[in-house]
Amino acid sequence: MRTLEKQRKLKYALSAAAFCVLLLRPLHASFLIAPAVTTLLFTALPFGQTAKGKRAPDRAYRGRSAAAVLLALLFAGLFLIVWLRTKQLVSLRFFRWKEAFPLLLVALVGGAGSIPFLAGLLEAFPGESKCTEQAAVFPGPAGGKTVISREDRRLLFCVALVTVSVCSLSSPLYPFNDWVDANCFFTVGKSMLYGIVPYRDLYEQKGPLLYALYALCYPISHRSFLGGWLLEIAAAWAFLSLAWKSHLLLTGRRDPIFLFLTAALVYTAPAFLKGGSAEELSLPLLMLSFYYGLRCIFLNRELTEREAFLIGLSSGAVLWIKYSMLGFYLGFILVPAYRMLRNGRGLRLLKLLGLIALGVATASLPVLAYFGYHRALDSLWEAYFYNNLFVYGKASSLMNTFRGLASGMASMLTYNDATILLVLFTLVTLWREKNRTAALHVFLCFCFAFGLIYAGGINLKYYSEILCVFIPLGVTQLMKFCGRARETAQNAGEKAAETGSPEKACGDGFKQRPDFGRVSRIVIPLLFTLALFGSENSYMLLQKRSEMPQFIFAETLKDETDATLFNYGALDIGLFTTADILPSTRYFCMLNLPSEEMVREMEHYMRDGVTEYIVSRGLEVESPSYRLLQTAEFKDNGTLYPYYLYIRSTEGSKDAAPVQELP
């Protein structure tokens, strides 16, 4: 009995320490306020509540909890040291108290508050499942039935709406999404509606399906990302719905707190960046396949024909959005294929692979038909496949590949640490649950996805956002782990053994603190909303449009109905969007591509005055054909950037690009 008690304390301490690390995710001390308030509230609530007709927790329970708190503080301190070293806040000779003190404060509060916080969260929403003798708290797979009720749909939509509205710069709560990549996608997408063919007429590097999605956003709003905001809400709703179904599959319980934790961890990660990335929009596609894989493994069955076709359809969509994310599917198919071959089901496997290929072909046919009709298949191959594989990447040797993978892991620890922690936690817990097949499946999916993303040697902040597809399973495993360890679950199990009524025991266990449950139903959603402001984008909430260079320059160009423009020295800063201008040159902005042709063409644009205007960020234009018209400055996440708008000083030249007028 004493050994079990020690194990229980250790589980509490590890849970608290793990959650403490999650609390320390934000890079800025100001973002730690919401987690600190959260833990303080939940430290006070559980131990101060009493139920009708029942006494408060006895002295022994308080003593065990106090011991667990002290042990948790020890673990929190150890994690804090490692964390500060990782964030380079601690050196060998000095300690930056000004930067580290807020982290230390939250570590102490988080270490103590995580125990009642995690236990309380699981009791706040008892769910609607029926307990069984096998599991009084988590009944496990609900027979494969994961139907989402109307109430759940409303909850999912509300969570998606609030999350995207707070975390994405595309939201109306923010003045403008100034992320250069999102503006590139929007510019190419709207150009497609005017007959401009990507790659052939307008050079960019992402997939054509991504541009088609942004083309759908243009009719909603020509000069803002209102359409992009709606697109992100739809993607978040689809992703969270599939995550919810996977949680129902593994636990059989409706736990709204699962949605809150999952949404907060995925969309406040620094890898989320500013919203509208290819990775963010592809999350529901990967989550669909991941959910089907989990269902096959946990229910011990094979993929159905419908599931195989939909997996192929989703992978085909990912192929034409950003094919470097296809590594997930390479790892995904290995475990199901091995199980079928081991059971002598080779013909069945071939049939399913054929259906997957049919799904890929179905997704690819419209893309190939579009470029074939415009006689631009060669441009599609050169720009999207060849240049990205052999020009954009740096992995020219095996050593460079290993360097790219190491750099990618360091990037994940900095910008998407929650995913790494939860993947490791998932693998350990699945292995201890004797579910080795599921652990192997998750491991292969993660390794192949991670490998294909970073093997090319390029490492950008937002690359790891697609790996957030593993967060829902990690949150589910964390909740299961804490649920098995909490004291109320033990009491419910003991009462069930005495009375022979596990249903009654489960119900009594959840009703021990009804006041806490009622308070939590109000407090938790509020704290979830506050936690979303830990997003790196929240600093833009106080910005006005009139202060942003994109709108300052757009005001200057508002009377120009036939203006031509190209973006020099950087990716699309957003003037094409705010001024509603169509690009008139193939290289409309400076891409992250070591291309001599692009540099040569842009020098030609500047030398011969091809466009009427040039906009630049942080780089001055030195050309006799242009003169400086306007300047502006804007502080982006603490860094001050100068912006320049140039106007053609001559009448142009015979090489000037034809103007493509907007209606």
What is the meaning of each model-derived region?
Residues 43, 47, 116-117, 241, ...:
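Hydrophobic, aromatic-rich transmembrane alpha-helices
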Residues 328-361, 486, 505:
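Perimembrane helix-loop-helix junctions
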Residues 243-266, 300, 306, 440:
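Transmembrane-helix signature of polytopic, membrane-embedded enzymes
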Residues 230-252, 288, 292:
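Transmembrane-helix motifs of polytopic, lipid-linked glycan transferases
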Residues 17-24, 306-325, 329-335, 362, ...:
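Membrane-interface alpha helices of multi-pass inner-membrane proteins
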Residues 97-108, 327, 450-494, 498:
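Hydrophobic/aromatic-rich transmembrane helices and adjacent perimembrane loops
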Residues 540-595, 602-621:
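Short periplasmic/luminal acceptor-recognition loop of GT-C membrane glycosyltransferases, typified by
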Residues 272-282, 460:
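Short acidic/glycine- and proline-prone juxtamembrane loop motifs at membrane-interface regions
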